[in-house]
Amino acid sequence: LYFGKERAGMFTRLATSLVLNYLRKWDVASCNRVNKFVAISRYIAERIKKNYGRDSDLIYPPVDCSYFKPGFANDGFYLMVSPLAPNKRVDIAVEAFNSIDLPLIVIGSGQEEKKLEKMAGKNIKLMGWQSDEIVREHYANCKALIFPGVEDFGIVPLEAQACGKPVIAFGEGGALETIVSLD
């Protein structure tokens, strides 16, 4: 359960502890009945190995590269496509772009929308939810995609790359399997 920076009350902590204890026992019992684990990334395969001591087959999620065509335009803006949730770390991108005063467009909606609207400087545009066509158009016209979250895999960076755009990502999680470092 995610409580953000707020401290949960004693009753909530106790109830959460009991529920999590039950879920751990159920998880261990359930995993022992699994014939074959399938992971969507090496990152997840490593977690399966660590938590359950089991190997897994690796099958990456697909991206429709015929839908996402390379775009050679560069309208000078950076792009972030994400649900606006705490674990997606959109706030970190907004803070960073506020400090460097470069244009950032954020496509997505969610529980952090109001907070991010208050944080965003004049160089940051929050567009809310958009259709696939609008997202594709923005991929094709952006300078680069910003991806600060730690994801199990991360389809968004692949969609941007299918449009010929570079990705600036946090160096952890599944993104490390699809993004080559410039080091």
Regions found by a protein language model. Name each.
Residues 114-136:
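Nucleotide-activated donor-binding/catalytic signature segment of Leloir-type glycosyltransferases, i.e.
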Residues 46, 50, 54-57, 62-76:
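Acidic anion/phosphate-binding donor-loop and adjacent secondary structure
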Residues 140-152, 165-166:
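Acidic donor-binding loop of glycosyltransferase active sites
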Residues 5-37, 45:
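Membrane-proximal helix-turn-helix segments that form the acceptor-binding/catalytic region
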Residues 38, 69-88, 94-105:
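Conserved donor-binding/catalytic core segment of Leloir-type glycosyltransferases
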